[in-house]
Amino acid sequence: MGQVNSSFENAVNCCDARSGSRRPSFVKDYNLVAKSLKKEERVTLSAADWEREALEFIAEQGVQALAVEPLARRMGVTKGSFYWHFPGREALLEKALLRWEEHDSRNLNKSLGEIDHPRDRLVSFFRRVPREKLTHEVYSELCAAAGHPQVEPVLERVADRRMQHLSAAFEELGMDPERARNQARLTYSVYLGFLQLQRQNQTPNLSSGAFDDYIEHVITTLIPG
C-alpha cells in the first residue's frame, strides 16, 4: 500500500511539473482519504496491540528477529502506525518485556501467593504451565537471548521473584532455609530444563495426556507429600 501511494503521488507531481497546473479535485480527494486511513491506523491500533503482537512474534521467532517492518506487515498496517506509538524498536521491546513481566508476576501471585497451603502452591506452579503457553514460550526465547542488554535484567527479576516464592513454600513445608533454597533451585532448574528440551522437541505436547503424566511425575518427585 505504501509503495502504491508513493508511486501515485510521484506521478501526480510529475504531471504538475510538466503542466504547471493545479492538482485536480480527485487528487485532493485521494490525499484526504490517504490521510484519513493513516489516522485510522493510529487510532485503531494502540501501543498495547503492538506490545502483544511483539510478544507473539518473540515467542515464534525470538528476540533478535523482532523488527518494525515485518511486525507491521504481520499486523496489516504501515510502519507509520508503529512510530505513532514508539520512537523505535528498542522502545517497543522494552514495553513488551515489561508487559510480559507484569503478566508473569500476576500469574505467580495467583499460583504461589494466593493459596494458603504451601504444597498446593507448588503444585499450582507446575500445573499452570500448559495453561500459560505463550508466557512459557516467550520465557524460553528470552532465555535464549539472555545476554541481550534489555532482556538480562528482566530475566534476573523474574527468576528472583520465582525463587523467593518457591523457597518460602518449601520453608513452610518444614525445611530449614538453606535446604529450602536448594530445593527451590532444583525445582526451578527442572522448569528451565523443560524449556530447553521443549526447544529441541524432546517434551510431550502441552495439551497431551503424556504432558499431564510428566507434570504429575515432577510433582511427586520434587514436592514433599
What is each residue range found by the language model?
Residues S46-D49, E53-A91, K95:
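Helix-turn-helix
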Residues R89, A96, W100-D104, P118, ...:
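Hydrophobic/aromatic residues within well-ordered alpha-helical segments
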Residues K95, R106-Y139, T187:
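Hydrophobic alpha-helical connector segments
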Residues S105, V123, D160-S167, E171, ...:
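An amphipathic alpha-helix signature
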